Amino acid sequence: MHVIRRMTRVVSTVAMVAGIATPMAVEAVRATPSAASVNAGSIAIGYENNGADPSIISVANKYFQREMGHDVRLKLFTSGPAALTSLASGQLPFMCGLGMPPVIAAIAQGVPLQVVFNQERYTKDAGLVVKTSSGIKSVAGLAGKSVGLVIGSQSSFELATYARKAGLNLSSVRLVNLTPPELQSAWATGRIEAAVVWDPVYDFLVTHGGRVLMDDSKLPVTATSFNICVANKSFASKHPAVARAFVKALGDGVSYLQNHRTAALGVMAKAAGISVATAKVEIAGYQIYSVSDQATAAVLGTSSATSATSGTAQSLLNNWRALYRAGTITTRTPKSAGPFVNPNYAK
């Protein structure tokens, strides 16, 4: 799944993320990189600013360079759909911070992607926010209202799930397709009365005249929103050591959060352009997965043979069914999502 709180401040802050000079970042630069990237060439990694998130620690502290070599280029995207062209062209062998729908859209178009790291499950950091002045009291009350969302992202799936449970026909809702920064602006100008979005814009709406109507904690695990990292299957199979180093770098971010929580909150706040207090609230709204969690039944599966029954694969299938029903994608849901989930690089 996911982007900008104080727009001008954050855009400039995030643009400099790769050069943030925290003590840990300096240490990471001085460390000898692994040999994983030998013969792999220049490596591009895409990511999103999802607010307080362990992957932003890996970016800020230069763990990708430490684990994969110095010839790593980081590219910021404002949303998952915005990254699809680069993913489809093969320019990005790795991408983080994605929701399921953009990944499904890419796979449906024949892009050889696999989920290699499930970063976290949203619980309190994403959902449906309504303006207190709108008079909307329930999901059914969205009929005739303007709702902002990133069509083709996790927000499409969440809104469809909320609507189905409430018996709301989405054809009665005025859907406004916006990027997260545009969504924040539309909220401020009164163009929309409700929104389905994730942090940090989610928190902005809540603190600027919004009320949470539904959040992801109300959804079952297999229907909820995840931030996931994908690899180009062709690239990763040719360079498995690079893929393992990529996963290791992500795990380093989680470990830093677990072992240096106060410092980690400061790193995430600076990188995401938010306050430490906000970072603390946001990180509490996730169920975060470490490297050791990846190869378990609840996350990616214990092996390639069991990946199809993993929590991530089941969520992917449920997202796919919802997107197909909504007409967002025209490719029928496959019988199994096992081929699109790979726990082996986390072992």
Report the location of each language-model feature.
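Short, low-complexity disordered leader/linker segments with a strong preference
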Residues: 1-42, 347
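Short, glycine-/small- and polar/acidic-enriched structural segments
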Residues: 33-169, 174-177, 193
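Solvent-exposed, polar/charged alpha-helical surfaces in well-ordered, non-transmembrane soluble domains
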Residues: 62, 66, 85, 89, ...
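Sec/Tat-exported extracytoplasmic proteins
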Residues: 67-68, 91, 96-99, 107, ...
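Pocket-lining segment of extracytoplasmic ligand-binding domains
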Residues: 101, 176, 181-272
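Short, surface-exposed acidic
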Residues: 170-173, 273-284, 329-337
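Secondary-structure end/capping motifs
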Residues: 238-326
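Conserved C-terminal helix/tail region of periplasmic/extracytoplasmic solute-binding proteins
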Residues: 316-347
